From Swiss-Prot:
Keywords: Acyltransferase, Cytoplasm, Iron, Metal-binding, Transferase, tRNA processing
Gene Ontology CC entries for this record: cytoplasm
Organism: Photorhabdus laumondii subsp. laumondii (strain DSM 15139 / CIP 105565 / TT01) (Photorhabdus luminescens subsp. laumondii)
InterPro entries: ATPase_NBD, Gcp-like_dom, KAE1/TsaD, Peptidase_M22_CS, TsaD
Catalytic class of the enzyme: transferase
Compartmental location: Cytoplasm
Pfam families, sorted: TsaD (PF00814)
SS bond list: none
Catalytic activity: L-threonylcarbamoyladenylate + adenosine(37) in tRNA = N(6)-L-threonylcarbamoyladenosine(37) in tRNA + AMP + H(+)
EC number: 2.3.1.234
This protein's name: tRNA N6-adenosine threonylcarbamoyltransferase
Binding site for substrate: L134, V135, S136, G137, G138, D167, G180, N272
Cofactor note: Binds 1 Fe(2+) ion per subunit.
Family matches, as Gene3D superfamilies: 3.30.420.40
Amino acid sequence: MRVLGIETSCDETGIAIYDDEAGLLANQLYSQIKLHADYGGVVPELASRDHIRKTVPLIQAALKEAGLTCKDIDAVAYTAGPGLVGALLVGATIGRSLAFAWDVPAIPVHHMEGHLLAPMLEDNSPEFPFVALLVSGGHTQLISVTGIGKYELLGESIDDAAGEAFDKTAKLLGLDYPGGPVLSRMAQKGEVGRFVFPRPMTDRPGLDFSFSGLKTFASNTIHNNSDDEQTRADIARAFEDAVVDTLAIKCKRALEQTGFKRLVMAGGVSANRALRIKMEEVMAKLGGEVFYARPEFCTDNGAMIALAGMIRLKGEVNDSLGVIVKARWPLSELPPL
């Protein structure tokens, strides 16, 4: 069984082919970073138009990479939400159309379920149950996962997502877009302890997050200090340490609350080196294990959508020809398998 996966929820066009026996057969990705760089963020209209240009050629490239033709595809999975509506409609329309033309099932996939399942692309994949930390530019959530579609929201950000805070603070430091990864590289040169940022909402019970205050704290710190390279690196280090510590504290609480011994990290920020090191330390002390995908599968990609589609194919598939996408879509609305 082979599933073609299509990801167009934001500013990456991702196409992949997943085989239930052989694993990942093809993975094609086009990033729109250069397209949006001059604007300092994603422009939805430009994103949609670029997905229109890139999606079909990338599907052709994926088929060629896998040595397959359309006749070898058994289902088409596409991201149906959450995300930018215009961008989602591109992938959904193409996915539905191809499925109809090829006479195979079309499977709408939840973008965050794709991220959550991405570590299962690795040889060392997690078993249920586990706590999932979904951490990206648009989401920061802690979720109890006891099976496919069996998701309970434990906590989430009440304002900025962690990845959004990274990008905004990077912009304050004068770093190029997208600034989060650049800030992390700069932080490696920073001095530990020169600046100390707060660990928001860790002094009270609960598993919710808040990162907007860190951005304000960073802005004030930048304004009140010199603009030399070392100072900027020290501020970057203090900011990253604060975010990483906050995430670690909340993850530890979630694991203690659920009694689970497995932690899954997913989403773009899960590729952060400092966060991975910290979580390895936390799980070692708890006698548990942390799982995450390789960096290229942490950010948006077609492989996670193809895998999620393969898994969802085992459940009930909607055969209607309607193209429905959702800008907002709670994970809790997904049916269990």
